[in-house]
Amino acid sequence: MAARFARGFVNRNPRNNELMGRQAPNTGYQFEKDRAARSYIYKVELVEGKSHREGRLVHYQDGVVISASTKEPSIASQLYSKTDTSAALNIGRVLALRCLQSGIHFAMPGATKEAIEKSQHQTHFFKALEEEGLTLKEPAHVEHSYETDKTFTWKRYPQKPTRQDKLDEL
């Protein structure tokens, strides 16, 4: 019965593939020290300028998808200062709200834990994102296999060592 409905399924939210675990994060950075910072689908970052703050949600292929800045008149009119800690906190709230409204629920933080702990602006920004409901961790990727997709034509088998491999160990 479920197969009848699955045949006519149209994904109207292409960004929902990350939520369902279908899209794998960017890979190929196994030998780099900061491979976790480069392997993401969405990344949230706070850009601090001299006279403003800007929060951005960056997709690994498309670049900036959603942003919120103290340059925007609607946000700037509600703030005492465009560069203080409360500005970073409110930019985090607005960005999280925009992300959730557009269907994006997971993102990786764009700064390291040390940088977040060192800066009050970063700390309040990421804390506001979490309080508003944006999860700062991406869901696990579902590996593409025959169990998850019956149209998959081959099955992975464990590789067994050859005679040459055994001779190399000696």
Swiss-Prot record:
Keyword Ribonucleoprotein: yes
UniProt-annotated location(s): Mitochondrion
Entry-linked InterPro entries: Ribosomal_uL18_bac/euk (IPR005484), Ribosomal_uS11_sf (IPR036967)
Keywords for the protein's UniProt record, in alphabetical order: Mitochondrion, Ribonucleoprotein, Ribosomal protein
BP terms from Gene Ontology: translation
Listed transmembrane segments: none
GO cellular component, one term: mitochondrial large ribosomal subunit
Single GO MF annotation: structural constituent of ribosome
Broad class of where this protein is predominantly found: mitochondrion
Assembly, per entry: Component of the mitochondrial ribosome large subunit (39S) which comprises a 16S rRNA and about 50 distinct proteins.
Family: Belongs to the universal ribosomal protein uL18 family.
Protein name: Large ribosomal subunit protein uL18m
Gene source species: Caenorhabditis elegans
Taxonomic classification: Eukaryota, Metazoa, Ecdysozoa, Nematoda, Chromadorea
